Amino acid sequence: MIILKDGYKEFADCMYYFLHYYIGYGRYTYSATNGSCDKGEYLDKRHNQCCNRCPPGEFAKVRCNGNDNTKCERCPPHTYTTIPIILMDVINVENAQPDHLIR
């Protein structure tokens, strides 16, 4: 177990998402073990496969289908996501609650 000092958890999470989504980790889906998946993934119950969640600032352009993983795309200008997500939509900044925005 690695213990991180205050403020380094965000860095570790950022590196995890970078490796997981951009270097090629998680490129393919895999069968869920005991109905659970790794951090940054979700269980697609239709196929019993572990699939990538899109990182904050991106949305699912194409959901995983049992063979190919989720295809994420950056949110368009003036929209956002704040959490790893599997939705195929983003939130318009004009409709956002003020406490949801990062300035």
UniProtKB/Swiss-Prot annotation:
- Please state the span of the N-terminal signal peptide per the UniProt entry: none
Q: Does the keyword Disulfide bond apply?
A: yes
Q: Which UniProt keywords apply?
A: Disulfide bond, Late protein, Repeat
Protein origin, superkingdom: Viruses
| Disulfide pattern | 37-50, 51-64, 54-72
Organism of derivation: Vaccinia virus (strain Western Reserve)
The UniProt entry, under SUPFAM superfamilies, shows: TNF receptor-like
Q: What is this protein called?
A: Truncated secreted TNF-receptor-like protein A53R
> What's the source species' lineage?
Viruses, Varidnaviria, Bamfordvirae, Nucleocytoviricota, Pokkesviricetes
**Keyword Kinase appears in the UniProt entry:** no
